[in-house]
A protein has these predicted regions:
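S-adenosyl-L-methionine-dependent methyltransferase catalytic core, i.e., the SAM/SAH-binding region
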Residues: 1-291
Length: 291
């Protein structure tokens, strides 16, 4: 991408945004985040780029509605929690945190505390199965309900002890890690936000644009993979149709990465948390195929 604007939907602490501006001298940046602490840090970090960097406090699903779309030539989203958020005890994301928060936007009213202390057993089962892919979700929901009888659960550390730190189904990842993932996704509506972002891209007039989405677990990756496949379909007639009646020119563009791009051994060594990252890339080229 040699000109125009690139949208960094997940600004965080400015790593990707800074690299984009450093390596693309004729490109402007539009970036957003819900985390005010991250915005404050990155605003200072990117100050040297002057007006080339625009930063918004926004959900990434809403950013395209706030900016001029005509010059957008790239969209990047790095889905999930940043390492700094995980490492800050007061944010309540980590297994040893002293509180129970997990909000991306600290001004939001709904937190992990509310999920853990007010959800019914059935609601907990739903998120553990759907978002954590925990085996026997009813078992872990019951542990929380039982523990609540002795008082509110106020810390992530206590919650982790209640759920258990042993691996499940022969995996090294603990039940608590999977449960925390499920609760975090519920608190921040992470899958809904991702779906809304992809839909906002589809509904926009953005053209000749590269979309790159980095995800960290199978639920997110599946959403991205399926949406990119849908965008690449020229024919959208129902499977039972005997012949094409849609015109066969409905593709939004093409999939650039047939398989997800994964980190190299060197990248994983430098950043072990990147080991499960997957990046999928799509090139929007509406042209005569514009919907």
């Amino acid at each position: 991408i040699k000109s125009g604007a690139i949208v960094d939907c997940t600004l965080g602490y400015g790593g990707h945004s800074g690299a984009i501006l450093e390596q693309n001298q004729n490109v402007n940046l539009i970036a957003c985040d819900q985390d005010e602490e991250a915005i404050k840090f990155s605003t200072e970090r990117l100050k040297k780029f002057g007006q080339r960097a625009q930063i918004f406090k926004s959900k990434f699903s809403e950013i395209l509605g706030k900016v001029e779309q005509g010059q957008i030539r790239g969209i990047l989203a790095d889905i999930g929690v940043s390492s700094l958020q995980l490492d800050k005890n007061e944010r309540g994301f980590g297994l040893k945190s002293e509180n129970l928060d997990m909000r991306m936007d600290v001004q939001a009213r709904f937190s992990a505390y509310d999920v853990v202390n007010s959800y019914s057993a059935r609601e907990l089962e739903r998120i553990f199965e759907g978002y954590g892919e925990l085996p026997n979700p009813a078992k872990f929901a019951a542990k929380i309900i039982e523990a609540r009888q002795n008082g509110e659960i106020k810390s992530a550390e206590r919650l982790a002890q209640i759920i258990g730190l042993k691996g499940v189904n022969g995996r090294s990842v603990s039940a608590a890690t999977l449960a925390f993932q499920a609760i975090r996704i519920e608190v921040n509506n992470e899958l809904g936000e991702l779906q809304n972002l992809l839909q906002s891209i589809e509904d926009s007039q953005i053209d000749e644009c590269v979309v790159a989405i980095i995800s960290f677990h199978s639920l997110e990756d599946r959403i991205v993979k399926n949406k990119f496949r849908q965008w690449a379909q020229s024919c959208i007639c129902p499977p039972q149709a005997l012949k094409c009646t849609c015109g066969g020119n409905n593709a939004l563009g093409k999939i650039v990465s047939k398989k997800a791009v994964t980190p190299s051994t060197a990248e994983i060594k430098a950043n072990p948390r990147s080991s499960c990252a997957k990046m999928r890339i799509f090139k929007i080229s509406r042209g005569k195929n514009a919907r």
